[in-house]
Amino acid sequence: MANYFNTLNLRQQLAQLGKCRFMGRDEFADGASYLQGKKVVIVGCGAQGLNQGLNMRDSGLDISYALRKEAIAEKRASWRKATENGFKVGTYEELIPQADLVINLTPDKQHSDVVRTVQPLMKDGAALGYSHGFNIVEVGEQIRKDITVVMVAPKCPGTEVREEYKRGFGVPTLIAVHPENDPKGEGMAIAKAWAAATGGHRAGVLESSFVAEVKSDLMGEQTILCGMLQAGSLLCFDKLVEEGTDPAYAEKLIQFGWETITEALKQGGITLMMDRLSNPAKLRAYALSEQLKEIMAPLFQKHMDDIISGEFSSGMMADWANDDKKLLTWREETGKTAFETAPQYEGKIGEQEYFDKGVLMIAMVKAGVELAFETMVDSGIIEESAYYESLHELPLIANTIARKRLYEMNVVISDTAEYGNYLFSYACVPLLKPFMAELQPGDLGKAIPEGAVDNGQLRDVNEAIRSHAIEQVGKKLRGYMTDMKRIAVAG
């Protein structure tokens, strides 16, 4: 099979990369009704599989789970989760032939085997759903022409998909129809009903394409979302210890610092995050971020180039075929790093202390978010998509580090994200070591003293922060999510 994106001509590639439309609330007036009375079978019962299924059932849909015979016979975790939540569970052969919509929510590396198994069992005119388009775009999976292929991609982990639904809200979601597989022209109706059933329409839905979702998702997770946090954690910890900081304190400052810093990012973008600093610290963080952007820009561009060309995917799929040798080696090496093995700090670190003593970390977040966003937009991805795949998801990933350091992050994210994370962080750490050697007192681990600043310089820096394109689109999207949340809670 050929990489689907690479079979398109340049005009088609640009059209699919640039497909992104923020959908109006009125477009979801029918809710999930298009799928009511139809049989929806989910393949896979992991975090997305279970939590999407719970939401869809609560929205009035007929949901069941198709699992491998061995998973049922051995009562594996997927079987236990589905049955304990009261779902009907059966084998592929028992459930797939009756399904109107089959949703494949297994890990990326299992998609080809799953799709090749279920396709012959699917009835004529059924629909196949994904929450990530890797199998279609990068693997180039060929789907029967009578089958409609759609995607609903919540921009949050499965657990948050469920929690936001229970609160009467939802999470921002991308939906798409594969242009090669919409024989009856009903793909968009199916995708909208599925998104509404998960609650996504209450938080904002982008009509996108399989191509735009995959290319932007891969770029975000490899660079700012995972790779930058891993590289930053390792570099900052080593620098703090080298400067004489207690390893336990250094570990806590970093482990919980990312989450604290990005909580401000979530509420008010880069502007609010930078406003948490004193004026002298803000000016220093801005200067550091500009240096970091200049150093890291070629690395971000290389990752985007390799994602667009398919080189990243072909390399990762070769590792799949080699029993994940590279992935497992990198995972083991990460677990042995000084940051991961440092003792726990029992003392308390106040919220503002994370900002005051984490100026470099804030600079890394700012540089990484802006670079990821800029690189995606320069490649033809629309700003709204780039925002969701950079700034929006960062607090969610930072939260995983706060739970159990880098180990937890790499367990929670997909194997695809983890593989890309290692590629980036293994290149980024040596790249930034000369920069780390030139840091000044107050950049990390110590607060920058209050002092006079030049009003003109502060004015210009504030304007540069606020006028960046990601701040403009972010303000619009965050405002929409807030408005939608008020509507959902009220009604």
Swiss-Prot record:
Induction remark: In the presence of acetohydroxybutyrate and acetolactate and by the activator IlvY.
Result when mutating R76Q: 20-fold decrease of the catalytic efficiency and 5-fold decrease of the affinity for NADPH
Location within or outside the cell: Cytoplasm
Free-text cofactor note: Binds 2 magnesium ions per subunit.
SUPFAM superfamilies hit by this protein: 6-phosphogluconate dehydrogenase C-terminal domain-like, NAD(P)-binding Rossmann-fold domains
Cofactor(s) demanded: Mg(2+)
Molecular functions per Gene Ontology: 2-dehydropantoate 2-reductase activity; identical protein binding; ketol-acid reductoisomerase activity; magnesium ion binding; NADP binding
Effect on the protein of changing K75Q: 13-fold decrease of the catalytic efficiency and 3-fold increase of the affinity for NADPH
Annotated phenotype, changing K69L: Does not significantly alter the affinity for NADPH. Slight increase of the catalytic efficiency. Inversion of cofactor specificity from NADPH to NADH
Ranges where the KARI C-terminal knotted domain occurs: 209-344, 345-484
Cited Pfam families: KARI_C, KARI_N
Outcome reported for the amino acid change (mutating R76D): Strong increase of catalytic efficiency and 2.5-fold increase of the affinity for NADH. 4-fold decrease of the catalytic efficiency and strong decrease of the affinity for NADPH. Inversion of cofactor specificity from NADPH to NADH
Record: residues binding substrate: S414
Annotated active site: H132
GO CC, alphabetical: cytosol; protein-containing complex
Keyword annotations of the record: Amino-acid biosynthesis, Branched-chain amino acid biosynthesis, Cytoplasm, Magnesium, Metal-binding, NADP, Oxidoreductase, Repeat
EC number annotated for this UniProt entry: 1.1.1.86
Function statement: Involved in the biosynthesis of branched-chain amino acids (BCAA). Catalyzes an alkyl-migration followed by a ketol-acid reduction of (S)-2-acetolactate (S2AL) to yield (R)-2,3-dihydroxy-isovalerate. In the isomerase reaction, S2AL is rearranged via a Mg-dependent methyl migration to produce 3-hydroxy-3-methyl-2-ketobutyrate (HMKB). In the reductase reaction, this 2-ketoacid undergoes a metal-dependent reduction by NADPH to yield (R)-2,3-dihydroxy-isovalerate.
HAMAP family: IlvC (MF_00435)
Oligomer status and interactors: Homotetramer.
Stated name of the protein: Ketol-acid reductoisomerase (NADP(+))
Organism the protein comes from: Escherichia coli (strain K12)
Upper taxonomic lineage: Bacteria, Pseudomonadati, Pseudomonadota, Gammaproteobacteria, Enterobacterales
Recorded name of the encoding gene: ilvC
